[in-house]
C-alpha cells in the first residue's frame, strides 16, 4: 500500500506558509508515538460508530469506513504502512492512511467532533492500561518464583539484620516473603490505578466538548472504559496525573527490585556465600577468568535509577501547566514508554535469576546465631520470669559485653558467668539460647515461626491467584 507523504496536516488552513524544517523536526512525535497506532484505530472505529448514530455518517458510509480502518490496521500490523516524520504524529499518519484507502470525501468525515487532544488522552490511557496488566503479570511471575524459593527452603534459618548488622535469627522463607509482600503492594497499586484510569476522555474535543450530538459514553463502552466518560472535558484533555501515577508505580517497582538485587549481590559474595547464581543468569569478565558476576541484579539497581528519573522528569514537565492542553504534554509519553520497556525486559530476567539461584543452607544456618543475635531472647526470657524489660535489656547487654570480653558466643557462657551477671539468670535460660527455639517462639501473626510463615505462604498464594487473573484479563 502506498505511503505517499502528501500534506495532510490536521492544522494549517489559516497559515500562509508551511512549518519551517526546524519546527517540523522539533514537533515530530511519530517516531515514538507510533506504538499507539492500534489504539488510535480502535478509537477511530468507536468514533465512526457515534458519528453514524448522530446521523453524520450513513450506514453505507459507516460500513465502508470500518472496512477502511480494518485494512489500515492490517497494513500497520504487517509494516506495509508506517508513519514518517512528515506526518508529525501518529494521528496525522493514520488519517493519511485512511484518506489513501477511502478518499477525502469519506475519509475526511472522521475528523468531525474530535481533536488530537481528546484522542491522545484516550489512547494513552488504553496503552498504559494494557501494559499495567502486562507488568502486573510479570510481577506475579516473580512473586511465584519467590514463593517457590521460600517453599523449597521453608526450614532454613538465617541471620536477620537491621543496619546490615546481625539482629535476630529468622527463617529464610520469612525474609523472602517480605519481598513478596512489597511486590504485592506494587501489584495492588497497578490494579487501583487501573480502576481510576478507566474513564474515557474521548468526546472532550479540544477542551470544550462537541456540539455535534455525539455520545461519549458510547465511545467509552466501545473502548472498554468501565467507568464511562470523563465528568469534565477540560480535565479530560489537560490532566496527566494518571501518567505521573503510573510512572510512580513503575519507579516503586524498580526500587523494590533494587532492594532485592542489593541483597543478592551481597549474598553472592565470597564473604557471605549465602547464594550461588546459576551460570545462565550470570556473566564473566573479559580479563579475569574466575569471575561470575551478578549482572542482572546490578542492572536492576541501575534501571531503578532510570525509572526514578522518568518519574521526576515527568513531574517537572507537568508542574506549571495551565488548563487546558499545552504542547509540553508531548513530553509525557517517552518517559513512561521507557518505563514500560525497561520493566518488561528486566522482570523476566530477574525472575529467572531468582528461580534458579542455589541457597547455601549450611552457611546461612552457621551464621544465624552469630553476632549475639539471641540476646533479645535472653531479655524476653527474663521478662517472662517477671523481670522489668528495662532491667532485662541491661542484663542481656551485660551478657553480650562479657562474651565480647571472653571472645565467646552467648551459649558458651557458663552457669557461673550467668549468675555473676544477674541473679535472675538461672541455668534454665539456656532453653532459649538456640536458633530453633528462638524461631518457634515468634509465632504471632506475621512472625518468623514456621507456623506463622506457613500462614503467610497460604495468604500470598491466594493473592497471587487473583493477581494472575487480573493480569490476563484485558479491558
Curated annotation (Swiss-Prot):
Its EC number is 4.3.2.1. It comes from the Bacteria. Its main location: cytoplasm. It is found in: Cytoplasm. GO terms for biological process: arginine biosynthetic process via ornithine; L-arginine biosynthetic process. GO terms for cellular component: cytosol. Keywords: Amino-acid biosynthesis, Arginine biosynthesis, Cytoplasm, Lyase. This is Argininosuccinate lyase. It comes from Streptomyces griseus subsp. griseus (strain JCM 4626 / CBS 651.72 / NBRC 13350 / KCC S-0626 / ISP 5235). The gene is argH.
Amino acid at each position: 500500500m502506498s505511503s505517499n507523504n502528501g500534506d495532510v496536516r490536521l492544522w494549517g488552513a489559516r497559515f500562509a506558509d508551511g512549518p519551517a524544517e526546524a519546527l517540523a523536526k522539533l514537533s515530530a512525535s511519530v517516531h515514538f508515538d507510533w506504538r499507539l497506532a492500534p489504539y488510535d484505530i480502535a478509537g477511530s472505529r468507536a468514533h465512526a460508530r457515534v458519528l453514524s448514530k448522530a446521523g453524520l455518517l450513513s450506514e453505507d458510509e459507516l460500513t465502508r469506513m470500518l472496512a477502511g480502518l480494518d485494512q489500515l490496521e492490517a497494513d500497520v500490523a504487517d509494516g506495509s504502512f508506517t508513519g514518517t516524520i512528515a506526518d508529525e504524529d501518529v494521528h496525522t499518519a493514520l488519517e493519511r492512511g485512511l484518506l489513501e484507502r477511502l478518499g477525502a470525501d469519506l475519509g475526511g468525515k472522521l475528523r468531525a467532533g474530535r481533536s488530537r487532544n481528546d484522542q491522545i488522552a484516550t489512547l494513552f490511557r488504553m496503552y498504559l492500561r494494557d501494559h499495567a496488566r502486562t507488568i502486573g503479570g510479570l510481577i506475579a511471575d516473580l512473586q511465584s518464583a519467590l514463593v517457590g524459593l521460600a517453599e523449597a527452603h521453608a526450614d532454613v534459618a538465617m541471620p536477620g539484620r537491621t543496619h546490615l548488622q546481625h539482629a535476630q535469627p529468622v527463617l529464610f522463607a520469612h525474609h523472602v516473603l517480605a519481598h513478596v509482600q512489597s511486590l504485592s503492594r506494587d501489584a495492588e497499586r497497578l490494579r487501583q490505578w487501573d480502576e481510576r484510569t478507566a474513564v474515557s476522555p474521548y468526546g472532550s474535543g479540544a477542551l470544550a466538548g462537541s456540539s455535534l450530538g455525539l455520545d461519549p459514553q458510547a465511545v467509552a463502552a466501545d473502548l472498554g472504559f468501565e467507568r464511562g466518560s470523563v465528568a469534565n472535558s477540560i480535565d479530560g484533555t489537560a490532566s496527566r496525573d494518571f501518567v505521573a501515577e503510573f510512572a510512580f508505580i513503575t519507579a516503586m517497582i524498580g526500587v523494590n527490585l533494587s532492594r532485592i538485587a542489593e541483597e543478592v549481590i551481597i549474598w553472592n559474595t565470597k564473604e557471605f556465600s549465602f547464594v550461588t547464581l546459576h551460570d545462565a543468569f550470570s556473566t564473566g569478565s573479559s580479563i579475569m577468568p574466575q569471575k561470575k558476576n551478578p549482572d542482572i541484579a546490578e542492572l536492576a539497581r541501575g534501571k531503578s535509577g532510570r525509572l526514578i528519573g522518568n518519574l521526576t522528569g515527568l513531574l517537572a514537565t507537568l508542574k506549571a501547566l495551565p488548563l487546558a492542553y499545552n504542547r509540553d504534554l508531548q513530553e509525557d509519553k517517552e518517559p513512561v514508554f521507557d518505563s514500560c520497556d525497561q520493566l518488561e525486559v528486566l522482570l523476566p530476567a530477574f525472575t529467572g535469576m531468582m528461580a534458579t539461584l542455589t541457597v547455601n543452607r549450611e552457611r546461612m544456618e552457621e551464621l544465624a546465631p552469630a553476632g549475639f543475635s539471641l540476646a533479645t531472647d535472653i531479655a524476653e526470657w527474663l521478662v517472662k520470669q517477671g523481670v522489668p524489660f528495662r532491667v532485662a535489656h541491661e542484663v542481656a547487654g551485660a551478657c553480650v559485653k562479657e562474651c565480647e570480653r571472653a571472645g565467646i558466643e552467648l551459649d558458651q557462657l557458663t552457669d557461673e558467668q550467668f549468675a555473676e551477671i544477674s541473679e535472675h539468670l538461672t541455668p534454665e535460660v539456656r532453653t532459649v539460647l538456640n536458633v530453633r527455639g528462638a524461631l518457634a517462639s515468634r509465632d504471632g501473626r506475621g512472625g518468623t515461626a514456621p507456623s506463622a510463615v506457613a500462614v503467610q505462604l497460604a495468604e500470598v498464594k491466594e493473592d497471587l491467584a487473583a493477581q494472575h487473573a487480573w493480569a490476563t484479563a484485558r479491558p
